[in-house]
């Protein structure tokens, strides 16, 4: 399930700040029930956190962002926001006025998607981005299969990286994340594709990676 969250900015103390990925993660986790929030936050493998999100888009005193994930997680978040719609994302205090479900993918044979993904290998004990498209395709498939298993969804999914550009973004103080802006051709079984599209493609989606949009 993918939702658009929008509303008003009550206060913002750092006018130069534009990247809120770490703050969005903290806000999202804080608005989930226990033990769901603890279970997600304490997972050893960040590869299988079944949600992702966009940055916050700001215009004047308005904001919006997108959050996408497994239905039970998103519905839990919505339920808690209905109880208290004032949230904090780092230096901002926001009042959420509207939550609107986004349209699901229409069933077809293949999809052209764009967005930012992480696909890594471990070298000398450190995670490094994969370089070759073939290796990235295989890793995206492997991670997707792991997520589908957790979701009890059967089905095949295949990836083909058509274009990629290396990006480095600030996550929080002292931590920068390397990823690829990609154009992906995705094919396979509709149910598998639909669920992976919702929960995020690739690794480390809880940092705001893996939110893809159909071209």
Regions found by a protein language model. Give the residues of each.
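RNA-interacting cores
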Residues: 1-215
């Amino acid at each position: 399930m993918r939702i658009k969250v929008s509303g008003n900015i009550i206060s913002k103390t750092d006018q130069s700040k534009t990247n809120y990925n770490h703050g969005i993660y903290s806000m999202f986790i804080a608005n989930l029930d226990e033990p769901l929030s603890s279970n997600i936050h304490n997972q050893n493998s960040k590869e299988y956190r079944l949600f992702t999100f966009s940055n916050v888009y700001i215009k004047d005193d308005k904001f919006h962002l997108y959050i996408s994930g497994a239905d039970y997680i998103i519905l839990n978040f919505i339920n808690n926001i209905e109880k208290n719609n004032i949230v904090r994302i780092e230096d901002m205090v926001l009042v959420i006025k509207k939550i609107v479900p986004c349209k699901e993918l229409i069933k077809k044979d293949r999809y052209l998607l764009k967005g930012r993904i992480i696909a890594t290998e471990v070298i000398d004990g450190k995670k490094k981005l994969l370089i070759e498209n073939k290796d990235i395709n295989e890793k995206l498939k492997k991670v997707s299969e792991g997520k589908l298993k957790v979701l009890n969804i059967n089905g095949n999914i295949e990836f083909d990286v058509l274009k990629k550009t290396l990006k480095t973004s600030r996550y929080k103080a002292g931590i920068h994340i390397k990823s690829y802006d990609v154009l992906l051709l995705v094919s396979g079984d509709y149910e598998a594709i639909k669920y992976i599209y919702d929960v995020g493609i690739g690794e480390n989606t809880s940092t705001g990676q893996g939110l893809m949009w159909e071209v």
